[in-house]
UniProtKB/Swiss-Prot annotation:
Bilayer topology annotation: Peripheral membrane protein
Record protein name field: Fe(3+) ions import ATP-binding protein FbpC
Gene Ontology cellular component annotations, sorted alphabetically: ATP-binding cassette (ABC) transporter complex
Keyword Methyltransferase in annotation: no
Length: 353
């Protein structure tokens, strides 16, 4: 393999319709060379359609798609200089790992010996050197996933596309393989567009996350930006769960805001807060509970569940039920206990109305 040639991706006012249904209305986005960008969102948000348009498996109704600055809008998939890792890996069960990786090269016109050499190099890149003789059934799920990545990378694409590549793995293996994907992308420096509905997965692997909703971009930013500074209640809840309650921003200056919630004032990071009515997003682990209700923000324990290293509570308040995660497992609160709710310094975000 020669050096990786990471390419950029640009969507310019792309619309995709299926009959009378508009899946993507006027979508514009960019992916910088050498970065891993995740398209994240619930089912039906348009992320898979976006990936298929980029791959050339679908064509836009209007707008332009560019890869590495080249207009590929009307090019077929085999002329786009992208490779895809499918959800199912799509490995041939009767072929060895080496033969699977070499298959795309041979189909692209490489001679068998050269294809084999490149395939061996590709397997080494993903940590499977010396395992080319094994059939897919003789590999773990994570190893099969790496074979699929190697098969895509040996074609030296400008952009690697990953369509929910970890969805068939169990939870423990997903954590390990997502770390391997991120390490490989950073080490080799290829451009990757990654589709998932799993928020933890997106936070772990991405340089940039694009959260999609109803065919559009709800918010784009770094994992930390989206988690700590959500632009809407939808983003706050989608990126790791949040309790959203009404508040009033009294003042915001020098990076700090003074807010009023349930008659009490609190100081939180201001970010882009503006004085006036707003919403406060509260992460489940951003509060402490005290077993006595006084003035201010208080509630009653409506439900609890012991989960080993923490307890999950539902607290009934005047603003509805709050979902709380409490690490103090030795001090579980009985049902119907009246509690006061106190905010920690982190895990709070103001959402402007």
């Amino acid at each position: 393999m020669t050096a990786i040639r990471p390419g950029s991706v640009t969507f310019e006012n792309v619309t995709k319709k299926f009959g009378n249904f508009t899946a993507l209305p006027n979508l514009s986005l960019t992916v910088e060379p050498g970065t891993l960008v995740t398209l994240l969102g619930p089912s039906g948000c348009g992320k898979t359609t976006t990936l298929r348009l980029l791959a050339g498996l679908e064509h836009p109704t209007s707008g332009r798609i560019l890869i590495g600055g080249k207009d590929v809008t009307n090019l077929p998939a085999n002329e786009r200089d992208v490779s895809m890792v499918f959800q199912s890996y799509a490995l041939f069960p009767h072929m060895t790992s080496l033969e699977n990786v070499a298959y795309g090269l041979e189909s692209s016109g490489f001679k068998k010996n050269e294809a084999r050499e490149r395939a061996e190099e590709g397997l080494k890149l993903v940590g499977l050197g010396g395992m080319g003789h094994r059939l897919p059934a003789e590999l773990s799920g994570g190893q099969q996933q790496r074979v699929a990545v190697a098969r895509a990378l040996v074609l030296e694409p400008q952009v690697l596309l990953l369509d929910e590549p970890l969805s068939t793995l169990d939870a423990r293996l997903r954590r390990r393989v997502r770390t391997e994907i991120r390490e490989l992308q950073q080490r080799l420096g290829f451009t990757a567009v990654y589709v998932t509905h799993d928020q933890d997965e997106a936070l772990a692997v991405s340089d940039t996350i694009i959260v999609m909703k109803e065919g559009g971009i709800a918010q784009k930013g770094s994992p930390r930006d989206l988690y700590e500074a959500p632009a809407s209640a939808f983003i706050a809840d989608f990126m790791g769960e949040a309790n959203v309650v009404p508040c009033e921003v009294i003042s915001a200056e020098n990076g700090e805001a003074v807010i009023r919630v349930a008659g009490l004032t609190h100081r939180v990071p201001a970010r882009n807060a503006q004085p006036g009515p707003a919403q406060l997003a509260i992460r489940p682990n951003a509060v402490t509970l005290q077993p006595q209700a006084g003035g201010g923000f208080s509630g009653t324990v409506a439900h609890s569940a012991y989960l080993g290293d923490h307890i999950e509570y539902e607290i009934e308040t005047e603003h509805g039920k709050l979902f709380i995660v409490d690490p103090a497992v030795e001090q579980s609160l009985p049902l119907q206990t009246d509690v006061s709710i106190q905010f920690k310094t982190r895990g709070l975000a103001i959402i402007n109305q």
